[in-house]
Regions:
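C-terminal structural segments of small proteins and small subunits
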Residues: 48-80
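NTP/phosphate- and nucleic-acid-binding module
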Residues: 10, 14, 74-77
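A short beta-strand micro-motif
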Residues: 4-6
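Helix N-cap motif at beta-to-alpha junctions
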Residues: 9-12, 47-51
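Alpha-helical structural elements
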Residues: 2, 11-14, 41, 61, ...
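Amphipathic, hydrophobic secondary-structure cores in small proteins
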Residues: 1, 10, 21, 26-44
Length: 80
């Protein structure tokens, strides 16, 4: 499954990128798509081979977490 996470700061994005890769994801740092708004403009796009609970994907560093389906983004959760 493919996911996209947005962040409040670039530091949070970098930290999450390392975290999610340690969990076994194929991940990359990218600019946030225009369809979505983000505080820092950076996002992490990642694919998980297995399933992780939402609590492990939506850490405190994440602003919003989306499931990616082509050009569509389904909001799975957010931190305020």
């Amino acid at each position: 499954m493919k996911y996209l996470a947005t962040f409040y700061t670039h530091f949070d994005a970098t930290k999450y990128h390392k975290y999610i890769r340690k969990k076994g994801a194929m991940a990359s740092l990218k600019p946030v798509p225009r369809k979505l708004s983000s505080s820092c403009g950076s996002c992490v796009v990642f694919t998980m081979a297995g399933e992780l609970p939402l609590e492990e994907l939506l850490t405190a560093d994440v602003e919003r977490l989306y499931q990616v389906d082509g050009d569509d983004y389904l909001l799975l959760g957010e931190n305020e």
